[in-house]
């Protein structure tokens, strides 16, 4: 029998001591006493219950065979048990008690990974993002790990590596905090929910582990070594805190079906103009996209990363049944999905090389003033500074979960967002268009140190408004 490698044995002897240089990607481990116990009613218990039942058969006396378990079967059962414990620890962090539907989707993703249906890397984009599937191989979500973001160390796309090596002076976006894209994705959904826009697919922060994710060679070697030690020397292998690859934290966004890139539909609409009612619906959805992007100051909004769903067949059937060119305004036949929100929430306005403009500002829809429907929906929210403060506090609760969270940097992010909200409020009151909104001077609204500590906030006494005059080298306006 081959001997285990010396480095694996050395790691096993020190497994009881906590590591001082754990990768920030790794899941915060639970105490062994806590995660060694079977969970009750937690996501993933159904699948792991079946695995436990399969292992229990080995311990029960059979009618045709003696109740003696072979060494190989004992090792296999031990390995399966340790892997289940690791999976339980991962699933413990993916509990969404306030949203059972989302928890069920994440559970399906975990179950699929356990049976070998792994997430599939998306070829498009500049980061490592993955289509997550259920056990039937149906796409149910998009997972974007923190470590594989455009400027992350484990980004599998070579384009950003070439960018970093060949043009380091222009590498990255100087106005954004590095490796915070997964929080930006979840934060965009939070803003969308608070403002009742309804254009961002549900997005939350989750932990997932899969062989198809991009791991370092060291992590993969450790995983193989621990499995080898557990298989050959079970007593030693059981001392490891985790068996298998380390979980990755990232944003999980529900997959939207029957949507196409906006670029496709915009060309179609130029050649085949929409009916008046459908045009109004599209304009309303477009204005919501503008409001979202402007508030979070999205630095990466092109016509290829927002989606449109237009149910032409349903509209045709409606026309045939009513023999009219008029349909119910309340029935939305065209919708917009705002995806790819990972490069938002800057801590300052872009003022270095590029301006990162909103590409929707050059569309014909951007020249139309904001509708009364949009003004009535948004103004009651953003004109109330108590609502704005609540929004900042909700974002704080989300962003502070990151290990590299910095309170001062977060306050700078909120100062930019408050300035954007202030401009948007003025534009809606003045009846401006999205294009005119994008041309307004950049404003920063900083929280005054002498402001009150209560929940009721007054703009004049608690905040200081500053106009940001510095423009980037390549300016859009």
Swiss-Prot record:
Any GO molecular function: 1-phosphatidylinositol 4-kinase activity
InterPro entries: Lsb6/PI4K2, PI3/4_kinase_cat_dom
Reactions that this protein is recorded to catalyse: a 1,2-diacyl-sn-glycero-3-phospho-(1D-myo-inositol) + ATP = a 1,2-diacyl-sn-glycero-3-phospho-(1D-myo-inositol 4-phosphate) + ADP + H(+)
Any Gene Ontology CC annotation: early endosome membrane
Entry keyword Hydrolase: no
Keywords: ATP-binding, Cell membrane, Cytoplasm, Endoplasmic reticulum, Endosome, Golgi apparatus, Kinase, Lipid metabolism, Membrane, Nucleotide-binding, Phosphoprotein, Transferase
Membrane topology of this protein: Peripheral membrane protein
Region: G-loop, residue numbers: 122-128
Subcellular location: Cytoplasm, Cytosol; Golgi apparatus membrane; Endoplasmic reticulum membrane; Cell membrane
Domain (PI3K/PI4K catalytic): residue spans on this chain: 116-447
One Pfam family hit: PI3_PI4_kinase
Region named Important for substrate binding: 149-151
UniProt-annotated binding residues for ATP: 129, 144, 253-256, 267-268, 340
Region (Activation loop): 338-358
UniProt signal peptide: none
Keyword Phosphoprotein: yes
Region Important for interaction with membranes, residue ranges: 157-170, 260-268, 353-362
Any one GO biological process: Golgi organization
Annotated region (Catalytic loop), positions in chain: 297-305
Modification Phosphoserine, positions: 45
Reported function: Together with PI4K2A and the type III PI4Ks (PIK4CA and PIK4CB) it contributes to the overall PI4-kinase activity of the cell. This contribution may be especially significant in plasma membrane, endosomal and Golgi compartments. The phosphorylation of phosphatidylinositol (PI) to PI4P is the first committed step in the generation of phosphatidylinositol 4,5-bisphosphate (PIP2), a precursor of the second messenger inositol 1,4,5-trisphosphate (InsP3). Contributes to the production of InsP3 in stimulated cells and is likely to be involved in the regulation of vesicular trafficking.
Family: Belongs to the PI3/PI4-kinase family. Type II PI4K subfamily.
The name this protein goes by in its record: Phosphatidylinositol 4-kinase type 2-beta
Gene: Pi4k2b
